[in-house]
């Protein structure tokens, strides 16, 4: 059976870029960006922010349940699947529990120095409201992960410090 990868991390750590590059390494692969699935909601989408209400939690759960179904279908057809999703400090990505049971599942946390995420955010978004919104997400995720990384490693997560790395 082909591999399944979940790449997670804070905003602006290179999840999508890394996921695409990883998927290209396999002869038959698919990249599933969870943000793209969430953007399929045309009316009523709720974006993560300082206030996580039940509606947001429900939408994230629904997106991840659909991603799980996509992963199972593609993987059953012989595709290597690479998911990219942000680290969710509320659910700890337990919506993927079904996939976590698979022996071919690899959970990868991209964890560069926070300064690198901040720099990438500013370069990508420029100054302004979007950059500030993403910077807030970076602070929240890094605040949580600073103490959580050892637990994640014990749970089988591969933690990759990408501070001085690029996808090449």
Task: Indicate where each model-derived feature is located.
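P-loop (Walker A) phosphate-binding loop of NTP-binding proteins
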Residues: 10
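Glycine-rich phosphate-binding loop used to anchor ATP phosphates in small-molecule kinases
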Residues: 58-102
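Conserved substrate/cofactor phosphate-moiety recognition/catalytic segment
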Residues: 20-66
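Hydrophobic anchor at the beta1->P-loop junction of P-loop NTPases
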Residues: 7
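ATP-binding Walker
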Residues: 13
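Small-molecule kinase domains that catalyze NTP-dependent phosphoryl transfer to phosphate-bearing small molecules
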Residues: 126-168
């Amino acid at each position: 059976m082909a591999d399944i990868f979940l790449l997670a991390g804070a905003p602006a750590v290179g999840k999508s870029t890394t996921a695409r590059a990883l998927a290209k390494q396999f002869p038959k692969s698919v990249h599933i960006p969870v943000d793209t699935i969430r953007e399929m909601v045309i009316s009523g989408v709720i974006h993560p922010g300082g206030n996580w209400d039940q509606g947001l939690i429900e939408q994230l759960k629904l997106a991840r349940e659909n991603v799980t179904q996509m992963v199972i279908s593609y993987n059953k057809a012989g595709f290597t699947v690479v998911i990219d999703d942000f680290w969710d400090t509320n659910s700890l990505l337990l919506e993927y529990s079904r996939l976590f049971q698979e022996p071919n599942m690899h959970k990868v946390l991209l964890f560069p120095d926070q300064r690198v995420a901040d720099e990438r955010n500013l370069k990508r978004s420029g100054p302004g409201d979007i950059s500030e919104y993403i910077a807030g997400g970076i602070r929240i995720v890094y605040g949580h992960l600073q103490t959580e990384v050892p637990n994640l490693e014990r749970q089988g997560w591969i933690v990759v410090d990408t501070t001085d790395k690029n996808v090449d």
